Amino acid sequence: MSSGAWVLGLGLALALGAVGARAQEVLRKQYDDGSIYEGTFKDGRQDGTGTYKLPNGFEYTGDWVAGEIVGTGKATYPNGSFYVGQFAKGKPDGIGKMTFSDGSTYDGTWIDGAMTGQGQSTYASGASYTGGFVAGKHDGQGVMTDPDGTVYDGAWLDGVKEGQGKMTYADGTLYQGSFKAGAPDGMGKLSMPDGVVYDGQWQAGQINGQGTLTKAKGDTYVGAFENGQRAGKGKLTYANGDIYEGFFAADERNGAGTFIAKDGTRYAGVWVAGHMEGAGQMTYADGSVYAGTFLADEPHGRGKMTYADGSTYEGAWVAGQMAGLGKAVYGKDQTYQGQLAAGKPEGMGRMVQADGFVYEGQWQAGLRQGQGRATYADGSVYTGQFAAGLRDGKGTLTTTTGFGYVGDWKAGVIDGQGIATYPGGEVYEGAFVGGEREGQGKLTYSADQISEGIWQKGRLLTPNPAANGD
């Protein structure tokens, strides 16, 4: 008799030659390849029940029909895996359970030696799956539970998540929507335990495309996303009522956009990395309007501010303050043109007031300080030093009345040494205190009339012995 031929794997096909034994008689037969069959035969072929062993460790015990493994039995494989269940044509077929060498199991439907149909699998990793299979892979509807508590309930194709499904993560995060190649892809909704919700397009497991993101505190963004971040055009509505509509990049406001605060403040212009930067226009809550360039959310560079009261400033800005060269118009009363720092005149500048007052010279912290020239409404002109906005130091005053003075000043008043010329032609040279002749001085009325001596509150108290005309 010839030896039998065996094919191993998930399926077995056995064809043994006739043995010439009586049907249903239990016989033991060893073949040339070392395999052994012990069981019943019929018409010279294995039939009924029997056990077949191969030298490599394979063993089958169960039903046989006309030389084939058909019916119910148990197969143990060389790698330690074993199958208990139904067979057809030498292969698992019908209902059965396979326990693999690594401890994984499959319990369910088999077709032609492959896991196909409904079944349940447990894996060495601790994961489990219940649902459809095709050719040993998850296919159709099924539920996968991972060791960390993550659960997927939905469609599968060729072993991967594909189609509509629901993914529940261990922390309570829930995704419901479309899957492709095992990851969220297409339209889907993600709900997180902290209240964050995204509803929109996905690609390869990432938020990509158009969608709506609602933050836990109520902020809502509707627009474009790229790899989980806001990118492209969108509208962000804050819980407090503020609104931004424009472009984003890397999850920040970037490019052209308009921000409107609930208090009425409005900015329309360029943004960089979430900040106002570049050309734009800001309308403030009080009605003031700035048009120009920005940096770090502040006016910076060149720009014009029109205030609610009608005042304007046009010129250079630094970090939100007027700084550099510019022109400021304060209501209808005065105009300043020149240098500024920290929002105030600083350096050289010219101030013109509606009443005719003009000052041109040095400034410090918004006050006249240093050398300058002031022309007053009555036509008087002062040229000299200033301090804290007042004439202070050396200076010359000329008036339309004929009075003139050259000398020292203190806190806006003639004080110190100087020469005063009066409308009548008199000339006083000497000391002053508080605008009056005080101390040593000489008053010349004419070439031959001089009053010289000690003065007090404008009057000569003690004439010098050599004085004439007193």
Model-derived features: positions:
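Signal peptide processing junction and immediate N-terminal pro/mature segment
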Residues: 18-22
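Terminal, low-structured helical/coil segments at or just beyond the last alpha-helical repeat
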Residues: 446, 451-470
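Bacterial N-terminal signal peptides
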Residues: 7-17
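N-terminal segments that cap or nucleate solenoid repeat domains
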Residues: 23-59, 469
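Conserved anchor residues at repeat-unit boundaries in beta-strand-based tandem repeats, strongest
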Residues: 36-46, 59-70, 82-92, 105-116, ...
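N-terminal secretory signal peptides that target proteins for export/translocation
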Residues: 1-2
